[in-house]
């Protein structure tokens, strides 16, 4: 074949290049390349845009997400500050406790597994033997108290059975990763459980058919938490308050000083693994917690105990329906030494009201309108009976009311008409304004008309012409109505306001009521003024009464009451100190001196006036009783108004240091409603114990060498017996510790009636037996006289010191180990 010429070759080449298929292929190649370039550029743009969004625009957010995944941020719980009484005794503290929990889904030793060959599904079944063994061992430790005394646990008790079943049921939940086995467990029990779990898992690391051991493990862990402890239970509960389940102050000082007590939590930031667990990291960042500060109170546990004890006795003896309250306060500084509202609650278990349930139920049903416990129809209207009376709800849940009542601090949350106690304030108004002096006389004819109202004194008695001191002792309503008229509505209101009755006292406690019930100056008409002058028109709180009376006797200064004396850090260093805060001067010193005189005249030596029952031999005491009708409350079943019996005392009367106040809300004593009989003795009893303790100045008479004849107290009510002994300078003790005996009559006493005993001797009174109880005489030889006296007193014995009181006891009149009646006089000879 002849080859084409070179010329023809060029033409052939041109023909080939012009092939359309080749041209299309070339275009595709160019397009593909361009598309690839565009795609790469676009992808790069998207990546760059994404990187821009991630790194720059939203960089902070994504870095935060990364940190959250890579870092573990743990809270370091601050320790809550403690609360102490004035002498450093702990009233509230925080302890470390543990929550014991299990992960049943990871506890392979408690379950057996089987696989379905057809479906491949794995099922787990409980191993009863393993569950029983583990549940038993954990329950024994939980109930042992110390994690060691397992043999002491009664496995037949209901407590054991309940705890065992709870643990068994929790461990049986194979699909659950978290089951609480127990809360608030102490460290000893927690360690014991940990040791048991470790030993169990070690023993089951490998299967041992000969020993019947299956391979597996149990997963039981613990979480640290804190528990608020109140070592004295219901003691001063209304003041201390309590914390909720999360540790936040909910009531009382715990609430008002929450930010001070709580402290500031810290943090630890460290790396964590894929399972969320912390990795050991030397670069971990820790922000230490700042523990809470401590509160040191003006409250004194010894004074508080005395106030609570006698208040409880009075509530029981007089069948008080609506609780009672007591306050002991420094009149010059406002420091509260004791504050009680009874019945109250145990802050260790503040939600529990069972101890007071019967009392609270009766109280709620006595005030159905107040608590709204009537049965309602679906439309919200009340169900009524055939006579149109509202019907009580028989299935109502009153638990919320019960808790609210027992939590309330009655001294600051509830209003009442003060009654005749207010006459002290009216007297102060009159003297300071120049409308009266101690010698101002007014006539009481037994009845007095104001507008359309006619007023009487108690029992409609006519007191005749009397001066200010006599009128206060006689508690003459008509005298003080006339004095109020002399003062006039405008000036009366100004003083009422100045004494602090139109505002809160400012005490450092939460929930002080801001609801005030009084007549404004423009509405204080002649009838309202008349009723207000003797305390029956304006409602106030007990603490308002105490601060006003304090101002009336301390030179005229209204002070802010306080419970916290100082705030300290964890090392005891004082951060803040609370001193006296004088709000204003209300009356002059000269007017205050007059008020002190007429209040002392009210109590005198215990032989005159309604206040005499508060007298304690050896002390100058001023006081005033008040029996008021609660016009704003439902009436009693007999149609009479409910009463409040109260009494306030100050001492020493010439230069008062402390005030003692007691109020009984709606006493149902079968014999009387009078506060001079019901409340005054309670105040006297409190004074009889706290005055010597505080070192209150006496009346100046040296009675150390005197003897007193013991009166015959058999057949007397316990409260009357106390008054008789206080007046003579003898101490007293109810032999039964049960406050319910306080209203009974004395059936036996020792020392016996007629015995000559040293001043200050304790007379033991019995209300349930005709035979005195016996006690063993301690051996006090070789002891100092003071220590011997303390030992004998602790055994319930009285003491007479003979010889050199600065020496040691050489002899004792009753042999050591002898059994004698409580109250027996033991003479110790010292040398």
Question: Which residues are covered by each model-predicted region?
Answer:
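Periplasmic/cell-envelope proteins involved in peptidoglycan metabolism and beta-lactam response
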Residues: 1-391, 415, 490-497, 616-617, ...
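Sec-exported extracytoplasmic/periplasmic mature domains
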Residues: 139-148, 198, 244, 262, ...
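Ligand-recognition elements built from short beta-strands and adjacent flexible loops
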Residues: 578, 618, 632, 662-831
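Extracytoplasmic
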Residues: 76-79, 86, 93-97, 176, ...
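Beta-lactam-recognizing serine transpeptidase/beta-lactamase-like catalytic domain environment
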Residues: 92, 98, 273-287, 332-421, ...
């Amino acid at each position: 074949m002849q080859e084409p010429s070179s010329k023809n070759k060029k033409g052939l080449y041109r023909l080939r290049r012009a092939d359309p298929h080749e041209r299309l292929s070339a275009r595709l190649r160019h397009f593909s390349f361009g598309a690839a370039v565009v795609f790469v550029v676009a992808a790069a743009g998207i990546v760059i845009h994404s990187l821009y969004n991630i790194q720059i625009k939203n960089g902070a957010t994504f870095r935060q997400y990364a940190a959250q995944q890579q870092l573990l941020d743990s809270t370091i719980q601050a320790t809550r500050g403690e609360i102490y009484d004035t002498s450093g005794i702990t009233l509230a503290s925080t302890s470390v406790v543990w929550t014991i929990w299990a992960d049943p889904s990871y506890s392979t030793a408690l379950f057996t597994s089987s696989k379905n060959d057809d479906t491949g599904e794995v099922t787990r079944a409980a191993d009863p033997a393993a569950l029983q063994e583990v549940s038993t061992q954990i329950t024994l430790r939980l109930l042992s108290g110390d994690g060691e005394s397992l043999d002491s646990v009664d496995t037949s008790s209901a407590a054991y059975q309940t705890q065992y079943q709870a643990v068994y049921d929790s461990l049986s939940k194979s699909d659950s990763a978290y089951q609480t086995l127990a809360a608030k467990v102490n460290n000893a029990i927690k360690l014991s459980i940990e040791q048991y779990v470790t030993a169990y898992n070690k023993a089951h690391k490998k299967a041992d058919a000969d020993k019947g051991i299956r391979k597996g493990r149990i997963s039981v862990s613990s979480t640290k938490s804190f528990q608020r402890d109140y070592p004295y239970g219901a003691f001063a509960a209304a003041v201390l308050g309590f914390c909720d389940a999360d540790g936040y102050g909910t009531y009382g000082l715990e609430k008002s000083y929450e930010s001070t007590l709580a402290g500031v939590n810290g943090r630890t930031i460290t790396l964590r693994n894929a399972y969320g667990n912390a990795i050991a990291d030397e670069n971990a960042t820790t922000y230490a917690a700042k523990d809470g500060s401590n509160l040191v109170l003006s409250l004194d546990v010894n004074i508080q105990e005395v106030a609570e004890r006698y208040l409880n006795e009075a509530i029981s003896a007089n069948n008080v329906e609506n609780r009672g309250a007591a306050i002991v306060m420094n009149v010059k500084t406002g420091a509260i030494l004791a504050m009680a509202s009874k019945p109250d609650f145990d802050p260790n278990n503040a939600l529990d009201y069972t101890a007071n349930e019967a009392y609270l139920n009766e109280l709620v049903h006595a005030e159905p309108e107040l608590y709204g416990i009537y049965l309602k129809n679906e439309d919200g209207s009340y169900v009524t009976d055939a006579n149109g009376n509202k019907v009580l709800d028989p299935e109502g849940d009153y638990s919320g009311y019960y808790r609210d009542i027992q939590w309330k601090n009655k001294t600051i949350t509830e209003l009442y008409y003060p009654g005749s106690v207010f006459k002290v304030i009216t007297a102060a108004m009159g003297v300071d304004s120049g409308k009266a002096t101690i010698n101002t006389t007014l006539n009481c004819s037994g009845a007095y008309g104001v507008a359309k109202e006619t007023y009487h004194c108690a029992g409609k008695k006519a007191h005749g012409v009397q001066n200010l001191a006599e009128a206060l002792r006689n508690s003459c309503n008509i005298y003080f109505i006339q004095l109020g008229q002399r003062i006039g509505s405008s000036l009366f209101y100004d003083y009422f306001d100045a004494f602090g009755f139109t505002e809160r006292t400012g005490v450092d406690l939460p929930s002080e009521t801001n609801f005030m019930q009084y007549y404004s100056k423009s509405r204080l008409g002649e009838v309202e003024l008349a009723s207000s002058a003797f305390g029956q028109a304006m409602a106030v709180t007990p603490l308002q009464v105490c601060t006003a009376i304090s101002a009336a006797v301390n030179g005229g200064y209204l002070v802010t009451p306080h419970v916290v004396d100082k705030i300290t850090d964890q090392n005891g260093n004082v951060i803040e100190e609370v001193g006296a805060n004088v709000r204003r001067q209300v009356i002059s010193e000269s007017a205050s001196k007059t008020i002190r005189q007429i209040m002392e005249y009210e109590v005198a030596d215990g032989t005159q006036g309604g206040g005499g029952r508060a007298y304690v031999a050896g002390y100058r005491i001023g006081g005033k009783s008040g029996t008021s009708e609660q016009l704003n409350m439902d009436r009693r079943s007999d149609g009479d108004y409910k009463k409040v019996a109260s009494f306030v005392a100050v001492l020493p009367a010439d230069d008062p240091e402390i005030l003692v106040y007691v109020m009984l809300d709606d006493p149902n004593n079968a014999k009387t409603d009078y506060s001079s009989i019901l409340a005054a003795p309670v105040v006297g009893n409190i004074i009889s114990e706290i005055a010597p303790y505080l070192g209150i100045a006496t009346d100046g008479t040296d009675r150390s060498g005197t003897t007193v004849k013991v009166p015959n107290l058999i057949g007397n009510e316990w409260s009357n017996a106390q008054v008789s002994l206080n007046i003579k300078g003898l101490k007293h003790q109810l032999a039964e510790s049960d406050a319910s005996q306080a209203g009974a009559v004395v059936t036996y006493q020792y020392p016996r009636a007629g015995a000559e005993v040293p001043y200050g001797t304790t007379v033991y009174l019995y209300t349930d037996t005709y035979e005195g109880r016996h006690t063993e005489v301690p051996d006090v030889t070789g002891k100092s006289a003071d220590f011997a006296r303390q030992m004998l007193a602790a055994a319930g014995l009285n003491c007479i010191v003979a010889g050199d009181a600065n020496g040691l006891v050489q002899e004792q009149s009753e042999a050591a180990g002898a059994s004698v009646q409580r109250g027996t006089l033991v003479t110790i000879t010292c040398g």
